[in-house]
Amino acid sequence: MTNEEFYNAHLGKRVLYKGKDIGAYVAGYIEDKYIILGFNDYTGCILYFTSKVYKTIGETYNSYRFAKLKYLEVIET
């Protein structure tokens, strides 16, 4: 599964990062490199992006973090 496919399938869903619940949601992606995780608080280390990155963000959060797809697992509700 590519980052874009993962993003399209799981936008806004909560995910585990390396098996831990860190309060992250699927917010976007950066080409084939990273999934952008969004946080409702300021847990993430990124607050703003350039306009190029904003094109791939589907939902707005208070902070963000990059993650490799291989470390993510969607929490099924």
Describe the residue ranges of each PLM region.
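Acidic, low-complexity, intrinsically disordered interaction modules
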Residues: V15-K70
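Short acidic DE-rich linear segments
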Residues: E76-T77
